[in-house]
Structure formats: C-alpha cells, structure tokens
C-alpha cells in the first residue's frame, strides 16, 4: 500500500490498517486521527506534522521515521521501534510509550525523559 491509497481509504472511513507496509511513505501533515497502525512498517516514513492523536501504533516499526511536530497525544506506541526516529517538538501528552525502544540516534524534544515513559534503550 502507498500513502495515497491509505489516505483515500481513511477518508472513506476505514481505520484498521494493521501490519500495513508504508516504509518510506510521505504522510506529511496527514490527518489520521484514531487510525490503527498496529504492527505497521513505517520505517523511514515522513510523518512530520501528522495528526495521529489516539492512533494505535503498538509494535510499529518507526525506525528512522520523521515524526517532527506530529501530534501523538493519547496515541499507543507500546513496543514500537523508535530507533533513529525524529520526535522533535512532537506532542506526546497522554501517549503510551511503555516498552518502546529507542537508541542514541533517536531525537526527542528538549526535556523529554524516555525513562519516565518506561521506554527501553537499545
């Protein structure tokens, strides 16, 4: 599936995109509120400024994904792979990041404490 098809199906009311492969997808400023991307492959995807509040990204592969200024309020990112991801200025209020993994290359906003969110450093 590509970004265009995802957005078209989302606009038609579909919300369940479990395990979809959207590696390197360009979803800048996409409106995907409440979308289910459980186990999705979003490696290298550009989700900058995306509206993902309430989204289910449990177990998603977000390696090297750009989530700069994305709205992830209330999103589920449990066990997500955030190695090398960019989350600068991302809104994470109420997001569940427990068990999500990150590394020294993962970029968070200043003052964000991954340990307080029960994240795992790998």
Segments predicted by a language model, with ranges:
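Tandem repeat scaffolds
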Residues: 2-122
């Amino acid at each position: 599936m590509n970004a265009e098809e995802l957005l078209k199906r989302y606009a038609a009311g579909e919300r369940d995109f479990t395990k979809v492969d959207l590696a390197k997808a360009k979803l800048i400023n996409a409106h995907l509120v409440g979308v289910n991307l459980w186990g999705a492959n979003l490696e290298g995807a550009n989700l900058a400024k995306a509206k993902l509040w309430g989204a289910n990204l449990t177990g998603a592969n977000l390696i090297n994904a750009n989530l700069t200024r994305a709205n992830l309020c209330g999103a589920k990112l449990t066990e997500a792979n955030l190695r090398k991801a960019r989350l600068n200025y991302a809104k994470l209020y109420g997001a569940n990041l427990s068990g999500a993994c990150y590394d020294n290359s993962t970029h968070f906003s200043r003052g964000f404490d991954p340990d307080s969110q029960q994240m795992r450093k790998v």
